[in-house]
Amino acid sequence: MTRTEPVVDVLLSDGSTVQLRPIRPTDAPAIVEMHARFSERTRYLRYFSPYPRIPERDLHRFVNVDHRDREAFVVLAGDRIVAVGRYERLGPASPDAEVAFVVEDAYQGRGIGSVLLEHLADAARRSGIVNFVAEVLPANGAMLRVFADFGYQIQRQFADGVVHLTFPIAPTEATLEVQRGREHRTEARSIARLLAPRGVVVYGASATGQG
């Protein structure tokens, strides 16, 4: 199944702009390039192993989704993919789906994880999914904060060195308030960035300073 959706401009927490859209099969080379730019730590936190290269079988599965039981979004800075998020339904007609995302090192800490989670949850609800589940290493504090800060009612279990999270993705007043607050702060930073002086220009002075 294919689906055409417009590219969405996304304002990040630092006031910069990226774009988000559903993944495409033609994204495979860009996904490989992004993976090569990851630090060893980023790879380990996402895949729970060194995972130096993406096997062809995994790559094919990553970029081919049905937009119902499996969905994925990519985030682009210019023409370069810098993040990807996905969910996959746990079984036929299951109300649960596993969610995961990874952000290139240079773009971490700018709110991309929260943006991906929001769009994935919206898409999942339209496909009849009720709950997200996630497995996160305890060392991945940034990922745990993304889930915790979103306002979802999260159930946590720790087993075999992994934090297991389960949470309903229906909007609540808490999640909507978090989204509104994030949008307000992001817009404020964007305006401040736009109005920040780029330098001082002295009018009426020649290049030699002689008037």
Regions found by a protein language model. Give the residues of each.
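Long, contiguous binding/interaction regions
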Residues: 1-193, 197, 203-206
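Glycine-rich phosphate/diphosphate-binding loop of Rossmann-like nucleotide-binding domains
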Residues: 209-211
